[in-house]
């Protein structure tokens, strides 16, 4: 989600001047002189033109055959000629004016014919919104403007959306203005539900940047605070971790862990595996036939052929292996491939589809049930991800000196080791945890994911983590490590292209794709995530061992605000600013 600091705009921006009389006059249609709507007059005159022309052509053919002079006309023919000329004048005037207006009108005037002309010519308009977004319309721009009268065109569209005549999802394509579409959809939502969402910002966001790739049917955007923890000294480099969160103490705690790591010489990391997976499921008439395909896919002699077919999907996609499992006559095929700096779900799905099409030639009785059979496994806790890994498999470790444990973390090595064994290892086993042998890895993973434009839902498997603490150097120092087998991140595609998220990636030095070493930016981001988890685990376990958790959360993570009165005060202040 895009996070912007300044949402409010000046009253001048929210209340654009009324159209000049000359511009309003330029929008006059040829059918405005008639009492019927334009589409009805167009239909009538088009039918009159066609009928008159057909009648005259038929009569003239009859006169030629009977050698009757063409200039000898009766009353019916005179009426037909009159209708032909009148309809021709109307149609030429209507389409002529529309053509001239399409040339001389500015980009902001293209929306005036929405209801009359449909979606013609508006498909390319959203791409221009980034260059210059139009001023928000009245009523939709701010809460203070709500009681004012809407522009007539917008009022008609809102009414059509509320009545179900115009689908809400089609507004961007028909209007060619993503900001205006969001405002109209927002007003329609208010009228349908009877509830105000004025606390949800509308202005200050580039809606064209999410069209067709990040979010559908937008009505605003959510603001989240972004804190910075660090520096995290990792592999000899310093990183400042952007964390989008609403949980008090989280950034401060991670920051303390970063300090302890830095004062102990830093942390090191290693990427064990880099492969995104997709597992389609196919059904066969018999289990024997399913086993035959399983044997074919797992035969090393066939790997090169499968690789050629799979790798056609992208210049970055490289097939690494195929792992199969059977359930009756159903075959689950787990394809693994490298995906460069992209998270890679779309890339691997395309490659899998190529292979399935190829296999269909030799296995005609294969019935592909789904491109995803949950053996992948995406956005779900699973043993296959915990054991085999998915995305980037990373181990991050550090040795924390005895003095740092005492001065920075306010505890001792023995207490930390004992707590980790009883809580993270034994306690998680008692709970039957799957990949949850840690204190709060998900906190750090999710905060960094949201800040850097990753898929927050993939926090499920990306937070799989086992935290290990051991005494070293005769028990004086502490060795801490986190092993995370399935960190699913990318530095291109999806939400990474949004301005705020792109800025956070730039802060880490991993924005975009690496030209020299494809995939290195995504791998570096994965190690930074693991390093942040290492710092967060170290600090939280220390707080638990020292008995500081409740005290710190009551101080920094407990709201004492009267929300209702605060909201009312903020609304009053906003109205005063608007006035």
Curated annotation (Swiss-Prot):
Q: Where in the cell is it found?
A: Endoplasmic reticulum membrane
Catalytic activity line of the entry: (R)-mevalonate + 2 NADP(+) + CoA = (3S)-3-hydroxy-3-methylglutaryl-CoA + 2 NADPH + 2 H(+)
Question: For bias kind Basic and acidic residues, which ranges apply?
Answer: 570-579
Q: Which Pfam families match?
A: HMG-CoA_red
Gene name, please?
Answer: HMGR
Enumerate the InterPro entries for this protein: HMG_CoA_Rdtase (IPR002202), HMG_CoA_Rdtase_cat_sf (IPR023074), HMG_CoA_Rdtase_CS (IPR023076), HMG_CoA_Rdtase_eu_arc (IPR004554), HMG_CoA_Rdtase_N (IPR023282), HMG_CoA_Rdtase_NAD(P)-bd_sf (IPR009023), HMG_CoA_Rdtase_sub-bd_dom_sf (IPR009029)
Stretches for region Linker: 101-153
Function according to Swiss-Prot or TrEMBL? Catalyzes the synthesis of mevalonate. The specific precursor of all isoprenoid compounds present in plants.
Its pathway, per UniProt, is: Metabolic intermediate biosynthesis; (R)-mevalonate biosynthesis; (R)-mevalonate from acetyl-CoA: step 3/3
Please give the organism: Zea mays (Maize)
Q: Which GO terms describe its molecular function?
A: hydroxymethylglutaryl-CoA reductase (NADPH) activity
Map out region (Catalytic) in residue numbers: 154-579
Q: Where does the protein principally reside?
A: endoplasmic reticulum
Annotated protein name in UniProt: 3-hydroxy-3-methylglutaryl-coenzyme A reductase
What residues bear carbohydrate chains?
Answer: 311, 557
Family to which this protein belongs: Belongs to the HMG-CoA reductase family.
Q: What is one term from the GO cellular component aspect held by the record?
A: peroxisomal membrane
> What residues form the membrane-spanning segments?
36-56, 80-100, 524-544
Q: Does the keyword Endoplasmic reticulum apply?
A: yes
Topology relative to the membrane = Multi-pass membrane protein
Q: Which Gene3D superfamilies match?
A: 3-hydroxy-3-methylglutaryl-coenzyme A Reductase, Chain A, domain 2, HMGR, N-terminal domain, Hydroxymethylglutaryl-CoA reductase, class I/II, NAD/NADP-binding domain
């Amino acid at each position: 989600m895009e996070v912007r600091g300044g949402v409010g705009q000046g009253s001048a921006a929210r209340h654009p001047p009324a159209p000049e009389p000359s511009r309003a006059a330029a929008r006059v249609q040829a059918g405005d002189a008639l009492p019927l709507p334009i589409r009805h007059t167009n239909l009538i005159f088009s039918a009159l033109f066609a009928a008159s022309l057909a009648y005259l052509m038929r009569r003239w053919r009859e006169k030629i055959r009977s050698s009757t002079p063409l200039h000898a006309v009766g009353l019916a023919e005179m009426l037909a000629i009159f209708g032909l000329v009148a309809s021709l004048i109307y149609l030429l005037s209507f389409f002529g004016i529309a053509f001239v207006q399409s040339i001389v009108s500015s980009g902001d005037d293209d929306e005036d014919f929405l209801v009359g002309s449909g979606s013609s010519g508006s498909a390319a308009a959203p791409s221009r919104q980034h260059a210059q977004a139009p001023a928000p319309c009245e009523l939709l721009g701010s809460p203070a403007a709500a009681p004012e009268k809407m522009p007539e065109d917008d009022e008609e569209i809102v009414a059509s959306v509320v009545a179900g005549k115009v689908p809400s999802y089609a507004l961007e394509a028909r209007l060619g203005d993503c900001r205006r579409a969001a405002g109209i959809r927002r007003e329609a939502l208010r009228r349908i539900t009877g509830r105000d969402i004025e606390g949800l910002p509308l202005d200050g966001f580039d809606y064209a940047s999410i069209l067709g790739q990040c979010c559908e049917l937008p009505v605003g955007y959510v603001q989240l605070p972004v804190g910075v923890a660090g520096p995290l000294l990792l592999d000899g480099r310093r990183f400042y971790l952007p964390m989008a969160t609403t949980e008090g103490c989280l950034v401060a705690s991670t920051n303390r862990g970063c300090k302890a790591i830095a004062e102990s010489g830093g942390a090191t990391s290693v990427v064990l595996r880099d492969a995104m997976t997709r597992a389609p499921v196919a059904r066969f008439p018999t289990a024997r036939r399913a086993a035959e395909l399983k044997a074919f896919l797992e035969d090393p002699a066939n790997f090169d052929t499968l690789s050629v077919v799979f790798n056609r999907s992208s210049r970055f996609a490289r097939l690494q292996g195929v792992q199969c499992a059977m359930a009756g006559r159903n075959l689950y095929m787990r394809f693994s491939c490298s995906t460069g700096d992209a998270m890679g779900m779309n890339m691997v799905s395309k490659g899998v589809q190529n292979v399935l099409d190829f296999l269909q030639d030799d296995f005609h009785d294969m019935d592909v049930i789904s491109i995803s059979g949950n053996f992948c496994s995406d956005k779900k806790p699973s043993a296959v991800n915990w054991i085999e890994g998915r995305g980037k498999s990373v181990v991050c470790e550090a040795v924390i000196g005895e003095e740092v444990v005492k001065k920075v973390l306010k505890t001792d090595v023995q207490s930390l080791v004992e707590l980790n064994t009883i809580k993270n290892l034994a306690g998680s086993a008692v709970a039957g945890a799957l990949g949850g042998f840690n204190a709060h890895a998900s906190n750090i993973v999710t905060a960094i994911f949201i800040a850097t434009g990753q898929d927050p839902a993939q926090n499920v498997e990306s937070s799989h983590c086992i935290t290990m603490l051991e005494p070293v150097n005769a028990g004086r120092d502490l060795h801490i490590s986190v092993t995370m087998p399935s960190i699913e991140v990318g530095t291109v595609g999806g939400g990474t292209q949004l301005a705020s998220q792109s800025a956070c990636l730039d802060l880490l030095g991993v924005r975009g794709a690496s030209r020299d070493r494809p995939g290195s930016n995504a791998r570096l981001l994965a190690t930074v995530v693991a390093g942040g988890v290492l710092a967060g685990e170290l600090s939280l376990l220390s707080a638990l061992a020292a008995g500081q958790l409740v005290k710190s959360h009551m101080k920094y993570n407990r709201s004492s605000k009267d929300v209702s009165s605060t909201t009312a005060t903020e609304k009053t202040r906003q109205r005063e600013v608007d006035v």
